[in-house]
Amino acid sequence: MDKLKGLINGLILVGMLSSAQSPATATTAPQKPVLQSLNEPQTPATHRTLSIKGYKTLSGTKILFIRTPGLPMFDALVSFAAGSAHTPHNPGLAAVTYSLLNEGVAGKDVNAIQATFDNLGARMDMGISQDRIWISLRSLSDESRRTPALELFAQVLGKPLLPQESLPTVKSQLQYFLDHEEQSHAAQAQIANLGQLFPDHGYAQSLYGTRAGLTAITRTQVQDFHREAYAAGNAQITLVGDLTEEEAQRIGAQISAALPLGPATAAIQPVTSPAAPGLLRIERPSTQAYLRLAQPSVLQNSPDYVGLQMAMRIFTNRLTHELRERRGLTYHVDADLSALQAQGLLTIKLQTRPEQADAVLAHIKTMFSDFLAQGPTQQELEDSQQRLAGSAPLNSATNMQILRQLHAISAHNLPLDLDFATQAALKLNLISIKTALNRHYHADQWRAVILGPKTDQQPLPAPGESATNAMCRVPGEIVAS
């Protein structure tokens, strides 16, 4: 089990869990596999036509299933609308509840749970975001291994002890995450930018809560939140692997029946009054400046989402060519859409030299204004579509990749087709992309953050002038010139 590794993934802080519940902000080395047959072989990807089956239990649990009989194994992922943005008035409650889930069930503590899964050749993983939490199980399909693994998995989900004795440890670990978050320039720039877009909203809070909020949380609050947010009506189950349709239905019903009875939680409300466009400067000692620009966008199930996503791929390529390749001002720049469920978000982020942060910000705004006015070129669109068509089979090469896509389809109410977004993107034309861009974005609506040292500003170097002083990548968050 992987437990609470604090990660920043685009606009969503994701916590991955390990059995010891030990926090880290960097990816840890892969563990030695407990069972070789659970490792999917690295074979060249080929396109697979995969049929999605959908069901719903009487208690309201949504189930999606894809059969992949190539390997004698399966993956189950259970997701709840129980992320940090669901508890804005009790900061940290979602993270504390999530962290206590596998601390014990009847007759087993956290170590015994881990040992049982290991002995069965199974693996449990967990994750949390602002919107949702998820818990997954990978197991062999053989019934003698599958049955006890699923029984324990369902017990962890539906009847965790949420022990009082583990509460101080969990709070301490989340406090550690908050400490690290405050020391991370990238995290602070992100939180500040989210605060501009989502003032007084759960999305603007740290995934881990606040110090005062964590201190105040009681076991009774945790138990109440588990009973409400981890209810069958608030659950979504995705299954992928070597199972028959009857077995998948039975597994889904088994997991759903183990959960508390209850309806779906209230949806997170979208932001109605974001802060006015503008620039927020945060002075911090650093060898670089952290830049973030954001403005409202569309939800993932919007008809325009695919076109805007393609547009941002193209614009990212333009930014990379201009800022990295021609001027040597950054190692990496990215323009991307968020996967938040209540409010879409377009974000551009990069790191650059402090003395040229203002000039870089102005240049990005000018480039985006030109992009809105002119749209992409035919060559840019064809190149992006060709790359997408070539990489699409890689997205369904393994069960885990399929599971991730299936989870996104379930969470965002997307069409029941793994190829839907790819096929829609391949049908895009210049007019549809430019129309979508100008329908949703404005050149003067950026909320921007520059975090870094105060210094005299310099103009942009001419293309090619900074080749010998270009930004370079070194370990950690350090990007030196």
Where does each model-flagged region fall?
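Hydrophobic helical h-region of N-terminal Sec-dependent signal peptides
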Residues: 9-13, 17
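Bacterial N-terminal signal peptides that target proteins for export
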Residues: 1-9
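His/Glu-rich zincin catalytic helix
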Residues: 22-116, 120, 223-326, 447-481
